[in-house]
Amino acid sequence: MSTQYLNSNLKVFSLNSNKELAEQIAKHIGVGLGKCSVDRFSDGEVQINIEESIRGCDVFIIQSTSFPVNEHIMELLIMIDALKRASAKTINIVIPYYGYARQDRKARSREPITSKLVANLLETAGATRVITLDLHAPQIQGFFDIPIDHLMGVPILSDYFETKGLKDIVIVSPDHGGVTRARKMADRLKAPIAIIDKRRPRPNVSEVMNIIGNIEGKTALLIDDIIDTAGTITLAANALVENGASEVYACCTHPVLSGPAIERIQNSNIKELVVTNSIVLPEEKKIDKVHELSVAPLIGEAIIRVYEEESVSVLFN
């Protein structure tokens, strides 16, 4: 661990969503986590106290807005306010998983655009920069009027699969929306891509999964940004096997894995699911099929580059 930043004005704080990742990030940078307490009043309100001076410091807060989403968002907003009132020079919020990102547009009449609302709340509270990872909708970057560094998980995931030495790989997007992500993975692994085209022929009839691309006899690698209930990814894996894939792997950046997800993955044709630690994975979800990679080096390097006023774009590669 480097000690270059131990006595600097770079401060890293963690709230309650992902302390293990925050500790890994701080270790990569070469600093200890800042001292703060995050408690609850008797009625459930959040109480935060920063237990060291941060006047004139460049502060980075590590907080995924994952389950319980609303609790973690309120912790983050209150921490930002506390830092602002304590005269921090900059308040950089590091959100490995950005909750509410799936509500990025009005899909139906009279719906909110909640990802924009969250961006407004963070800015109004006093955030001066955002560092995040694999937004569900990249256009969310435009919801902010402060700098935002949008990191990608594809390099971490592709490096892992490259070391496995899999043969005859085809990268598969589980829907049309993920084609850009699949193409980035395919470019890194020098592999072709395939797309699963989901169609519902008529109301109350099960979706039909048509596969665009050649997957027969190949090792299929499904890639998505978020796996929530795992319905789409497991049905896609089954469709790939039925259409001739020799074996199926899957990967994602954000393992929400709610509801029946683990049971579905366990009983599916997926040989291995590779995820990152952008969201805490409870012990009961760490089944043999699930392999976790750390995003701490990537985020830690981004923090160093922001602090040193260096380019972050090199990390996109």
Swiss-Prot record:
Positions annotated to bind Mg(2+) 1: 136
Subcellular location per the Swiss-Prot or TrEMBL entry: Cytoplasm
EC primary class: transferase
Binding site for Mg(2+) 2: 175
InterPro entries, sorted: PRib_PP_synth_CS, Pribosyltran_N, PRibTrfase_dom, PRTase-like, Rib-P_diPkinase, Rib-P_diPkinase_bac
GO term, biological process aspect, one: purine nucleotide biosynthetic process
Required cofactor(s): Mg(2+)
Binding locations of D-ribose 5-phosphate: 200, 224, 228-232
A molecular-function term among this protein's GO annotations: ribose phosphate diphosphokinase activity
Residues where ATP binds: 43-45, 102-103
Keywords tagged on the record: ATP-binding, Cytoplasm, Kinase, Magnesium, Metal-binding, Nucleotide biosynthesis, Nucleotide-binding, Transferase
EC number(s) given by UniProt: 2.7.6.1
Recorded catalytic activity of this chain's protein: D-ribose 5-phosphate + ATP = 5-phospho-alpha-D-ribose 1-diphosphate + AMP + H(+)
Cofactor comment text: Binds 2 Mg(2+) ions per subunit.
Top-level division of the source organism's lineage: Bacteria
Pathway(s) it belongs to: Metabolic intermediate biosynthesis; 5-phospho-alpha-D-ribose 1-diphosphate biosynthesis; 5-phospho-alpha-D-ribose 1-diphosphate from D-ribose 5-phosphate (route I): step 1/1
Any single Pfam family the record assigns to this protein: Pribosyl_synth
Active-site feature positions: 198
Functional description taken from the UniProt entry: Involved in the biosynthesis of the central metabolite phospho-alpha-D-ribosyl-1-pyrophosphate (PRPP) via the transfer of pyrophosphoryl group from ATP to 1-hydroxyl of ribose-5-phosphate (Rib-5-P).
Self-association state and partner proteins as the record states: Homohexamer.
Entry similarity comment: Belongs to the ribose-phosphate pyrophosphokinase family. Class I subfamily.
Protein name per Swiss-Prot or TrEMBL: Ribose-phosphate pyrophosphokinase
